[in-house]
Amino acid sequence: MAEITAAAVKALRERTGAGMMDCKKALNEANGEMEAAVDWLRAKGLAAAAKKSGRQAAEGLVGVMIDGTKGAVLEVNSETDFVAKNEKFQDFVKGVTALVLEHGSDIDTLSKAPHPAGGSVNDVLTANIATIGENQALRRAALLEVENGVVVPYIHNQVAPGVGKIGVLVALESEAPSDFLESLGKQIAMHVAAATPLALDEDSLDDAAVERERAIAQEKAAESGKPAEIVTRMVEGAVAKYRKENALLSQIFVVDGKTRVSDVVSKAAKETGKPITLKQFVRFQLGEGIEKQETDFAAEVAAAAGV
């Protein structure tokens, strides 16, 4: 059996909100596997569902930029939050976000693209690392485009114009007036930032994630002792709830707390007299899925001193 450390118990407790002894038992049951321990706690009703695995612990910035009917979003990571406040770093993120519009979202291609300052993006990044004195890295990028309509950007927790901690793009396909679409898109983008949808619609949700929810619901329902047909209904109800809560078009609009996003779009289309399609969205949260390595500062000092 794997050794269960205090750090692992602490990490599981922070992630799930479950009690310390429950977290220790879950890790024992899961042989030290964090994801399996989360599932065990949820199956026992001891932890709330987490839409995203892992803590958001990496630093840096997310940038967004629009050019006509195209929009780009980029995440650049750094070691500390101090770098995110550095104007040179902010300008770098903005500049490379603009290059996504031209060269696309593939990070390898982007790294080799020519930078306005001279050399490649990677050359400028390397120079910045030397100047600022801290490691930095391009993590991910996305590009949205529509033929007719708008791509609307939104930055949450803005650090400087166009860069912040959460970046969202919303693509609306329509021949409705652009100012009308931009207003609608801004509201939907703010919703996306707050509601963290995992997919545009229920059919687009990750099959493995849905089946994981089904397995957790099955185990939880089976422990209720109810007849098999009721257990089946409980499981299907839980899966349906998961789908509605995680698909953007099925979510309840955070602005009014009662209307589904799909109905918000339909109502807007009727208002303007032109069909409107919510084509796509992208949401980047800084450090999503990355855990920063925790270190013992005293041990680091001792190691550096050769103690």
UniProtKB/Swiss-Prot annotation:
Subcellular location per the Swiss-Prot or TrEMBL entry: Cytoplasm
The protein's role, per its UniProt record: Associates with the EF-Tu.GDP complex and induces the exchange of GDP to GTP. It remains bound to the aminoacyl-tRNA.EF-Tu.GTP complex up to the GTP hydrolysis stage on the ribosome.
InterPro entries: EF-Ts_dimer_sf, Transl_elong_EFTs/EF1B, Transl_elong_EFTs/EF1B_dimer, Transl_elong_Ts_CS, UBA-like_sf
UniProt organism field: Zymomonas mobilis subsp. mobilis (strain ATCC 31821 / ZM4 / CP4)
Signal peptide: none
SUPFAM superfamilies found in the cross-reference section: Elongation factor Ts (EF-Ts), dimerisation domain, UBA-like
UniProt keyword Repeat present: no
Protein name according to UniProt: Elongation factor Ts
Pfam families in the record: EF_TS (PF00889)
Keywords from the named record: Cytoplasm, Elongation factor, Protein biosynthesis
Region (Involved in Mg(2+) ion dislocation from EF-Tu): 80-83
Cellular component GO terms held in the UniProt record: cytoplasm
Gene coding for it: tsf
GO molecular function terms attached to this record: translation elongation factor activity
Protein family membership: Belongs to the EF-Ts family.
